[in-house]
Amino acid sequence: MLVVFFLGILGLLANQILGLPTQAGGHLRSTDNPPQEELGYWCTYMESCKFCWECAHGICKNKVNKSMPLIIENSYLTSCEVSRWYNQCTYSEGNGHYHVMDCSDPVPHNRPHQLLKKIYEKEDL
């Protein structure tokens, strides 16, 4: 009984450290609009998801990482859906491309999209 209690406490602490919620079961149904309190987690490992950016007039700023440069809205931003079931976190780009990882051992999936990112320069106006 003590072991079960200890593992339960350890699981709750891991969720708080990783920024994951302590909702019933910790599950998140597939969504393109994850809870605000989870953006820090999701946008760290797949920064090209549209829900990570706030865009106006073709210029976008990252909602989570304020030190990121402004970017030009282009094909770098993808319409992602994210989901979580037990310890499996999934990013789906809707075109058959998806990335699955252990939520407690996340792996960034930013590289495929980095080539498309265009940093905003004042001369671009």
UniProtKB/Swiss-Prot annotation:
The cellular component terms of Gene Ontology attached to this UniProt record, alphabetical and capped at eight, are: host cell endoplasmic reticulum-Golgi intermediate compartment; virion component
Q: Coiled coil located at which positions?
A: none
The main place the protein resides is virion
Extract the signal peptide range.
1-29
Q: Where in or outside the cell?
A: Virion; Host endoplasmic reticulum-Golgi intermediate compartment
Name the protein family.
Belongs to the asfivirus MGF 110 family.
Q: What's the name of the protein?
A: Protein MGF 110-4L
Instruction: Name the source organism.
Output: African swine fever virus (isolate Warthog/Namibia/Wart80/1980)
